[in-house]
Design a protein with these regions (language model features):
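Cell-envelope and extracellular/periplasmic
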Residues: 84
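Active-site regions of metal-assisted phosphoester/phosphodiester hydrolases
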Residues: 1-74, 78, 90, 101, ...
Length: 262
């Protein structure tokens, strides 16, 4: 075998290795959400927010059905999605953009990992209202293929800034640094909503240790001690909270109605 063939095979093996690995992504930032929906300035007295781990739209029946997910998402103003499917050689659009277009809403797909050079998996946001800006931060350390991030979305609510943070974290036993970083970011804003799947209940020691002291669990009245999906708020009042059972996904849909603190 000639040297040129050896070099060619070596490059091919390196390429196959790089393409088959799930890679984290770099920090990104932007201004506006995507979509053709007209920019609405939110002036209402209350805002409905939700968090939903959509499990790639695969329900407990094994069927992948994005329509069932969209039916729940459309009931709220701002919805943070986790475990959203990205694009690939055979998928032109990520699931956040598909839901956004189905509902005529603004949307953003926040890539957590790349596979075969495509944004394969991530979180997402579906919103009735446009952002002032947003920024995505990768979270480390990560384990295996489970790369994580958080995205901070900056909204203006009747002239008042409100930050909405969306994330999906691994269990604290696999590393507490990502949770600490998310909670630190959450504590930087006077009015903030933290959405996501934390893979830990609110009473977990790490959650209690890192949460800002003035944090309110918007879903506390639902009486689900083992819940790992969170809507946490600061500088905001919770009017009511509700959930919808598993079925369209292996996670329930959780929502809350909030308002500014006078």
């Amino acid at each position: 075998m000639t040297a040129s063939w050896i070099i060619l095979i070596a490059f091919a093996l390196v390429g196959l290795f790089a393409a088959s690995r799930a890679w984290p992504v770099r920090p990104t930032h932007g201004v506006r959400l995507n979509g053709e929906h007209e920019d609405d300035v939110f002036e209402g007295s209350t805002l409905s927010v939700a968090t939903y781990n959509i499990h790639r739209a695969r329900g407990l029946d094994g069927e992948k059905n994005l329509d069932r997910i969209a039916e729940l998402v459309k009931t709220c103003d701002v919805v943070g999605l986790q475990e959203a499917e990205g694009t690939s050689l055979f998928r032109r659009h990520d699931q956040a953009s598909l839901i956004g277009r189905m509902l005529g809403r603004l949307f953003h797909f926040s890539t957590t990992r790349r596979l075969l050079f495509f944004p394969q998996r991530g979180n997402g946001l579906i919103s009735r209202f446009q952002t002032q800006s947003w920024e995505t931060t990768p979270l480390f350390p990560s384990t295996g293929r489970a790369h994580r991030n958080m995205t901070v979305y900056h909204f203006e609510w009747a002239g008042v800034p409100v930050a909405v943070i969306n994330t999906h974290l691994s269990k604290p036993a696999e590393g507490e640094s990502p949770l600490e970083e998310v909670m630190h970011a959450f504590g930087q804003f006077p009015r903030a909503v933290l959405l996501g799947d934390f893979n830990a209940p609110v009473h977990h020691g790490a959650m209690r240790r890192f949460m800002p002291s003035d944090t309110k669990d918007a879903l506390s009245g639902l009486d689900d001690q083992d819940r790992v999906d969170m809507i946490l708020v600061r500088g905001l009042k919770v009017d009511q909270a509700w959930s919808r059972p598993v079925g369209p996904s292996d996670h329930p849909f959780f929502a809350a109605q909030i308002r500014p603190v006078n």
